[in-house]
Amino acid sequence: LTNMVEELLEFSRIEDGRFTLSIEPVDIKAELEDAVYTYREFFRREGIVLNYEDCDEDFDPIPADPERLRQVFSNLLDNASKHGGSGKRIDAAIRQEGESVVITIRDYGPGIPEEELPHVKYKFYKGSSKARGSGIGLAVCDEIITRHNGSLEVGNAEGGGCIVTIRLPMGT
């Protein structure tokens, strides 16, 4: 309930213009790794395996709000655990594509019905999922990434499950 209230407050800040970013140089790879390691033990206790695919590249710091990025990573990992069904596996990865950092978070659950995919980032949209949640978290994540001049895409992964792809620019 507390998380739902926080998400509602966050979205109201976005809608009325009180939502701000505190931009600073951020080690995006370290932020993702911190989120993965924070959740890994919790997930293990729940019977969920959280894999992390680390690319060999080191990234220059990117201009971003580290607190907001942690919020996005936490929300996406939490969503993957809630909607992963009996898949009991989550994969997180980071890589460079051109001038972008690409982060993916994938679960191995049933995926999202094709007719629902265009709506999943709308506020309060919960689709046919029986999982708990407010239907706001993904909308907030999308807004945070958009304000970082990036994109957040949600789709079904080849072989099953859902995959969320974040693209953030490497430069200013």
Where are these regions (language model features)?
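Short alpha-helical Gxxx[C/S/T] motif in the catalytic ATP-binding
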Residues: 137, 141
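Short conserved segment of the HATPase_c
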Residues: 112-124
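A conserved beta-strand-to-alpha-helix junction within the catalytic ATP-binding
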Residues: 22-40
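Short conserved segments within the C-terminal catalytic ATPase subdomain
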Residues: 42-52
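Conserved micro-motifs of the catalytic ATP-binding
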Residues: 16-21, 61-64
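Short helix-loop "hinge" at the ATP-lid/N-box region of the Bergerat-fold HATPase_c
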Residues: 80-81
